[in-house]
């Protein structure tokens, strides 16, 4: 209540309150990143708030948490490549964090994605061709989000990847 009052009247927060607020925001973001499943709406709101803090909240320790979470998500995806929900969740997280100035080092995530891309053509389409196409579209969108050039995601046999 005191912080809201001070902000509403345009007064700056005392340094002790500002530091406390940044710490709580940092921990809230960390908890959202570590939660299963991730509440993306809450995480997005927290990240937007953190972006107004001049980079003091989105620091190296949160970068480490993001990297670890994304690495776990790609490992889960390697184990369950046909589950579109896992692809979409990783893509949604990547969309939120990739533009942030956090110095993310996602080489393991990108390598896992590349490995999955090589396996995607061998996945059986099952009985639902539309679901297989949706999975492929989601997977290619994830690749684009992770920084792969669209042409590098094409296979020599596009029928197999879209099957």
Give, region by region, the residue ranges found by the protein language model:
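Extended alpha-helical scaffold segments
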Residues: 1-163
């Amino acid at each position: 209540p005191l912080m809201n009052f001070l902000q509403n009247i345009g007064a700056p927060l005392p340094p002790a309150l500002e530091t406390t607020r940044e710490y709580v925001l940092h921990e809230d973001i960390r908890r959202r990143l570590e939660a299963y499943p991730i509440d993306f709406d809450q995480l997005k709101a927290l990240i937007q708030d953190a972006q107004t803090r001049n980079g003091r909240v989105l620091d190296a320790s949160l970068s480490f948490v993001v990297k670890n979470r994304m690495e776990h998500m790609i490992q889960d995806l390697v184990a369950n490549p046909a589950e579109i929900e896992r692809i979409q969740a990783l893509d949604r997280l990547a969309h939120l964090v990739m533009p942030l100035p956090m110095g993310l080092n996602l080489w393991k995530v990108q390598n896992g994605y590349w490995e999955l891309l090589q396996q995607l053509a061998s996945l059986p389409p099952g009985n639902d061709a539309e679901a297989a196409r949706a999975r492929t579209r989601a997977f290619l969108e994830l690749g684009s989000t992770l920084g792969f050039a669209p042409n590098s995601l094409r296979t020599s046999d596009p029928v197999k990847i879209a099957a």
